[in-house]
Amino acid sequence: MLHFPVLLEESVDFLINDLDGHYVDCTFGRGVHSKLILEKISSKGYLSSFDKDPEAYEFGLNFKNDNFKIRHDSFKNLDKYFKDNSINGIIYDLGTCSTHLDNAKRGFSFNKEGQLDMRFDNTVGEPFSEWLEKAKKEEIIEILYKYGDEKHARLIADAIIEMQKSSPIRTTIQLASLIKDVY
């Protein structure tokens, strides 16, 4: 399933202030924003896109346009690629998208069985299941509350810690079931 951003037209129309300008899509994903930006800018305009997800990067390499370049890197490294004041506009569409949730192998889905990974770039860092095994209760609470806006963060953390005593949580369905039981 393709990810369709909310307010796509409006956000791109607001972004483009010079048809000949240089724009940056910091979260390429499946290229929905990038495609529309490329349709709207002139032949003198340019679009640079970033994604640290290897699958998104590979997908972006299929965009055949001389006014476009995708980089397999995090947007936190923008200053490595551009001089000050060389960009007319930047767009971010943060968070997970349907392509992450629909693919059980990515480890984000709570509807499909898969290894509990949850990394945008699975070549960097450790899977979430490994982090969860070592995490302290307060760290789990902070992650759930801060990034998941989870009102039952403390109860879920307690359940995770308790379950980890008998067996590690390795799959998305194990975690989803545990959270469901808390509710």
Annotate each language-model stretch with its function.
Residues 1-183:
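S-adenosyl-L-methionine-dependent methyltransferase catalytic core, i.e., the SAM/SAH-binding region
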